[in-house]
Amino acid sequence: MGVLKFKHIFFRSFVKSSGVSQIVFTFLLIPCCLTLNFRAPPVIPNVPFLWAWNAPSEFCLGKFDEPLDMSLFSFIGSPRINATGQGVTIFYVDRLGYYPYIDSITGVTVNGGIPQKISLQDHLDKAKKDITFYMPVDNLGMAVIDWEEWRPTWARNWKPKDVYKNRSIELVQQQNVQLSLTEATEKAKQEFEKAGKDFLVETIKLGKLLRPNHLWGYYLFPDCYNHHYKKPGYNGSCFNVEIKRNDDLSWLWNESTALYPSIYLNTQQSPVAATLYVRNRVREAIRVSKIPDAKSPLPVFAYTRIVFTDQVLKFLSQDELVYTFGETVALGASGIVIWGTLSIMRSMKSCLLLDNYMETILNPYIINVTLAAKMCSQVLCQEQGVCIRKNWNSSDYLHLNPDNFAIQLEKGGKFTVRGKPTLEDLEQFSEKFYCSCYSTLSCKEKADVKDTDAVDVCIADGVCIDAFLKPPMETEEPQIFYNASPSTLSATMFIVSILFLIISSVASL
């Protein structure tokens, strides 16, 4: 491995040192191989960036009446209500226990409407049945709870979600008629946040207990609330008050085993605004991932769509994939989940359009950015970490150099990558990115990429880059014997002779 090779070269320069000296150098070497900026290790071995598909495409056929090519996705799951035993399981309000909410369209109260009025035990009993139904076996996968009707932080329930505040205040006033409105509001806030916290925590704890191999988390958590992209001077940053509120949700991050922020785009966002929007949301999620334990951060999987939220039949262009996928990879997240509805798969024509989009734009870009990320990880981190932007707010991306690589779709529907990296390509990685170690490992960033002899990286379905950067050379013998001066050789032979006499004397005793 790279780290072992580094140590071997390091020590070869000190062949004539004493054992004590080597111990000292070993001790000094260890700290330089550590880093304080850890990333979550891969969920699947040798898959540093994971792609998941969470759309109802199971009945969609492409050209030649064949299923859509899902070979690049490690986890696949349909959000349809009757789909079970999937790689991605998403729980909506009607699929996990008795989630209390007020219908935003009809105003109908469901399960008491607010968390203070639900029986937590009844909810957990029902949730247990739902979990075993949707997850009959505990295979590795994602468990995403999508409850968006109310937010556990009181202050974040602004219009139209202020109905949950009003209903909570009314409940307190009914039970405590002597309280003023100010007093009732404060008490309602405390009761709502406690009940909401208990509801979310106990639900996810039950999920982890029953299906521990799944990655449990809540969709849209954490959120940045940086939606003000139409205002002048928009820079995408999260408001300080929202960062503080995310800090106050440490109880939720402590129980989660994954984070699922959202980076959906709409057509109202300019290219610059879209980039800044996504960049800051992913960055905040990565910051939050370290709140439970900075040395063992949670994996971050960004939920995205391949269409716009306000034009659900318009696919993202390659540039817009850069704003979403490219940003997420370059910032060091663990993966992306592509979510979708039946809208882009409702007919044979729409399925063919999706199939063509995947062949010509989506899958080639996934191959591009994934191979570039793996190549950078192999060169800079010896595959024991991920490459992260040195300047998080730059537009540096992990992409294959188009002058040196071509991604092609062969006749059989299989992608191939032609070309090989140059030393200049690797130097670009080193100039723009640094190595962030996985939390389970200690690693050393390669000091000089010029020492790279070869690159050998693959992703799903055998799509690989396998190339020598230097011509193979014959193994050289240690310089101490062949390239030493006569005086050095004499001294060496003298030392060897003394050692031989000592060993012989000990052996004869």
Curated annotation (Swiss-Prot):
GPI-anchor amidated serine lipid attachment residues: S490
Disulfide-bonded cysteines: C60-C351, C224-C238, C376-C387, C381-C435, C437-C464
Propeptide residues per the UniProt entry: 491-509
Keyword annotations from UniProtKB, A to Z: Cell adhesion, Cell membrane, Disulfide bond, Glycoprotein, Glycosidase, GPI-anchor, Hydrolase, Lipoprotein, Membrane, Signal
Tissues where this protein is expressed: Testis.
Transmembrane segments: none
Alphabetized PANTHER family for the sequence: HYALURONIDASE, HYALURONIDASE PH-20
Protein name per the record: Hyaluronidase PH-20
Organism field: Homo sapiens
